[in-house]
Every structure is written in C-alpha cells, then in structure tokens.
C-alpha cells in the first residue's frame, strides 16, 4: 500500500489518520461523559480531566498534521457514479467535521486554561494559558464544548452511515477506499 493517496484509493497515512481520529474522538467523548459523573472523592476525579486535556492537545496537533497532509496528498475524487448532491454533501460534511473538531479543541483549551494555569501534556510539556478569565470563560466554553461534542458524534455517525449506504446499497468503492482496498484500482 502506498503512503500517498491515489485517484482510486486513500494511502496508508490518510487511512491511519482517519481511523486514529475516529477512535480517539469516540474515546474522548466517552471519557468526557464519564468524568463529569465522578464525585470529588473518586480516585479518577483529578486524573480523568488531566488525561482528557492531554489527549485533546495531542488531537489538536494531529488535526493540524491531518489538514497539512490533506493538502500534500489530496483525497481521491468522488466516484463518477455519485451525483452532484452526493458530492456537495460529502464536501460539506468533511468541512463541517474539520471545523467542529477545531472548535471543540479550542473550546476545550478555553475551559482548561480559564484559571490561568497551563495544560500539562502527560507531564512532558506545557501549553500556556494565553486567554484566561476565570469568570465565565470556563462555564461558557463548557456549554459550547458539550454541544460541539454531541455535534461531532452525530455528524460522524451520519458520515459512517453514508459510507455504509454507499457500500451496501450503492455497491460502490467509497468505504473500500478508506479501508485501503478498491476494486477499480487494478491491484496498485
């Protein structure tokens, strides 16, 4: 399998980034839902948010890499069997997912740094608090973060259902390409 995308399939880097992000986003969603249920006396009360913040910073760095990679190695064009509505919807959904991911990561940063303290990333390095206002910043960003998280999950579920629809009903290569296979790509 090639590193870069071809006209018929995604390369291993794009596929890896896609699935790592899919797993990480759902893991972060689950971690976020779980950590807000913890009581002060729970052993994970302080550890879970620190883990959530560290992974969030890593995801922001990964998202920048992903956007840069998308420009270096553009995705394959939509199959010719896709109509205009399908092509426009796919582009809009991808733009929305990227925008939502950036927004959720920024809102997480605003929650985490509202008290003026940096974010320690697994104890390896700190991300400084550049915008901090302990007043309403954390609460406002928290509400935004929650709504964005649900939006990402809902849109990504629709994204997955669309891929399954293409695979099962339309019987095209949309899903196969993101799995590293394509019947229209003569073995390359």
Question: Predicted regions: what is each one?
Answer:
Residues 1-188:
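Membrane-embedded alpha-helical bundles that constitute the cytochrome b-like, heme-associated redox core
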């Amino acid at each position: 399998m090639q590193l870069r995308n071809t006209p018929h399939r995604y390369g291993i880097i794009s596929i890896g980034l896609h699935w790592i992000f899919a797993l990480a986003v759902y893991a972060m969603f689950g971690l976020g839902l779980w950590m807000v249920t913890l009581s002060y006396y729970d052993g994970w009360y302080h550890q879970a948010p620190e883990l959530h913040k560290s992974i969030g910073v890593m995801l922001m760095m990964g998202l920048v890499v992903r956007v840069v990679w998308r420009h270096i190695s553009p995705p394959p064009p939509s199959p010719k069997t896709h109509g205009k509505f399908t092509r426009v919807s796919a582009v809009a959904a991808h733009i929305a997912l990227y925008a939502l991911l950036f927004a959720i990561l920024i809102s997480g940063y605003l929650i985490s740094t509202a008290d003026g303290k940096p974010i320690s990333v697994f104890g390896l390095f700190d991300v400084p608090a550049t915008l901090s206002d302990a007043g309403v910043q954390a609460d406002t960003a928290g509400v935004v973060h929650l709504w964005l998280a649900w939006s990402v999950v809902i849109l990504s579920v629709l994204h997955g259902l669309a891929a399954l629809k293409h695979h099962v009903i339309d019987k095209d290569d949309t899903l196969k390409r993101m799995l590293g296979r394509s019947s229209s790509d003569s073995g390359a």
